[in-house]
A protein has these predicted regions:
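Active-site- and interface-proximal helix/loop "cap" or "latch" segments in soluble metabolic
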Residues: 9-109
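A short, basic/flexible loop-to-alpha-helix module at the beginning of a structural domain
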Residues: 114-135, 437
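Beta1/beta-strand and adjacent pyrophosphate-binding region of the FAD-binding site
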Residues: 128-146, 162
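Glycine-rich FAD pyrophosphate-binding loop
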Residues: 155-174
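Glycine-rich active-site loop/strand segments that organize a redox cofactor
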Residues: 180-218
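Conserved redox-cofactor binding core of oxidoreductases
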Residues: 219-323, 344-345, 395
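Glycine-rich loop(s) and the adjacent beta-strand/alpha-helix scaffold that form part
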Residues: 320-323, 327-401
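An anion/pyrophosphate-binding glycine-rich loop and adjacent beta-alpha core
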Residues: 372-374, 381-507
Length: 507
């Protein structure tokens, strides 16, 4: 989007010329190009084409108009496009600084590495560039699901902590989560689960490629976690908890006749989203009411450690003005930075199989694995095998293959071809065939099984075949977990998913 006008200042304010600024948006590098006379901005070009098509990318014209009208980089932004708007403002600030002859501090590009070396090199930051110091006992890096849980618990116990987040808001809430033998389970009359058997089953399902100590921690402490969250969500903010148990939490018995006899612990919890409340936002409100807050727009640059190898804190960077901040954490640093689905370098090199069969993703594009890289730079041991969570819902048009396609705007020059976040009916175990019309796997399986089976088929994709009785069949299949939305949502929900796929050209 481009446009011309004259946002004026005093004569001689600017060095006439055209300047370019960039900043990381939610899924791409946002670029702003501004032309200055000696007293005014005469032209602005905003390129957000790599952002989400219907959100950030669509906001380019309005953001350009705001920059032209404001005569500065301080604009209101576009509602619903917060991260893209902030990136545009940051890029515009760089243009203004250049036009005024000011030194522009170059930021540490957090998504480092390349197609041959996913890790890249730890940034070398000059001490003179560190202009702020924060002392705390505990530092939490990342205000997503893990980070906000940790922050809420720390706040409830009056601990001295800080929490930072590279974006301008808390990250998406994962509404479904699990716990063993909670108070809700006891109230529903559920018998205590065989914890030793569950530990063995989870290890078997992972082919033994797991740390059973971590699994055991979840088994033994998840009920306490659920109780703590319920105190906040239900008792404090009045958001009801939904517990899935009984027959609703199990596949039909006939499924085991010619299939794996899975275990079905009643572990599924979520909160009523019809209230409009997102758990992470309420957790933010909770810690704020206790006198804490999140240091937003603050990115991890590197971990620091002493001569004994102990982590003592981090160096962070403000994503607003690029100044560096040292956080000294006397008792420790908790990394809650998520994975690396938004980084094709890491995806292809660390998980080539999962990458090859993926068509569409419902991940955060800002999740580029920087916390993992920083930990490895500091000496952490990285699991030798990736553990992706794949859903069988990445609907794409006929003829589209699984895996990356080239992209001029996405980070790393690659993106997955699908544009629909999740086509929930895709999980239903209807007939699934390859491009030759051949059935190739048992469709009644956990989410990722059919996806991996497609790795051996043409294009690494398949077609799902069903008829007009899909809702009746979905009730009979009685799949569980979040796939139950197709069954429980009824005709309105299903038709909405179909209409979205038809409009997208995928169905």
């Amino acid at each position: 989007a481009s446009g011309s006008a004259a946002a004026s200042g005093a004569t001689g304010t600017y060095i006439p010329g055209t300047y370019e600024g960039t900043a990381e948006g939610i899924s791409s590098t946002v670029k702003v190009t501004m032309t200055f006379s000696d007293s005014a901005v005469t032209d602005v070009v905003v390129d957000t084409s790599g952002e989400t098509a219907s959100i950030g990318a669509a906001a380019a014209d309005e953001l350009r108009d705001q920059l032209l009208a404001a005569g500065s980089a301080e604009i209101d932004g576009v509602s619903g496009s917060t991260i893209t708007s902030e990136a545009v403002m940051k890029a515009a600030k760089s243009c203004y600084a250049q036009a005024k002859g000011e030194a522009v501090v170059s930021s540490v590009q957090l998504p480092t590495g390349d197609e041959n070396d996913w890790l890249g090199t730890e940034p070398d930051i000059d001490e003179a560039a560190i202009t702020e110091t924060v002392d705390t006992d505990i530092l939490i890096v990342g205000a997503g699901n893990g980070g906000m849980f940790a922050a809420a618990y720390a706040a409830a116990n009056g601990l001295n902590f800080r929490i930072i987040e590279q974006n301008g808001n808390v990250q998406d809430t994962r509404h479904w989560y699990g716990a063993i033998d909670s108070a809700a389970a006891k109230a529903a009359g559920e018998e205590p689960f065989d914890r030793a058997k569950l530990l063995s089953e989870i290890s078997r399902y992972a082919s033994g490629k797991c740390d059973q100590r971590v699994v055991k921690t979840w088994i033994n402490e998840s009920a306490e976690m659920i109780g703590f969250v319920r105190e906040i969500m239900t008792e404090k903010y009045g958001v009801n908890m939904i517990y899935t148990y009984g027959d609703e939490a199990k596949w039909p018995a006939e499924n085991a006749e010619h299939n794996t006899d899975f275990m079905y612990p009643e572990i599924e919890y979520t909160y009523d989203r019809s209230s409009g409340a997102a758990r992470n936002e309420l957790l933010l409100q909770y810690i704020q009411e206790l006198g804490y807050d999140v240091d937003f727009k603050t990115s991890l640059a590197k971990l620091e450690k002493n001569s004994d190898g102990r982590i003592t804190g981090i160096i962070a960077q403000s994503t607003e003005d690029d100044h560096f901040i040292r956080y000294n954490a006397n008792k420790g640093v908790l990394l809650a930075c998520g994975g690396f689905p938004g980084n094709p370098y890491m995806m292809e090199q660390l998980d080539p199989l999962g990458t090859s069969v993926t068509t569409a993703c419902s991940y955060s594009p800002a999740d580029k694995g920087y916390g993992i890289r920083a930990a490895v730079w500091a000496g952490a041991n990285l699991d030798k095998e990736a553990a992706p969570m794949l859903f069988d819902r990445g609907i794409v048009a006929p003829g589209v293959d699984g895996g990356y396609v080239d992209s001029d705007t996405a980070f790393g020059g690659k993106a997955f071809p699908g544009t629909i976040r999740q086509y929930n009916p895709g999980t239903q175990p209807f007939l699934k065939v390859n491009r030759n019309g051949e059935r190739f796997a048992n469709e009644s399986s956990p989410y990722n099984d059919i996806v991996y089976a497609a790795a051996h088929q043409p294009g690494r994709v398949y077609a799902q075949i069903c008829d007009a009785n899909i809702l009746e069949d979905a009730k009979r299949f009685h799949t569980i977990g979040c796939s139950a939305q197709t069954r429980n949502g009824g005709e309105k929900y299903f038709q909405g998913k179909v209409d979205e796929a038809v409009a997208d050209g995928s169905l």
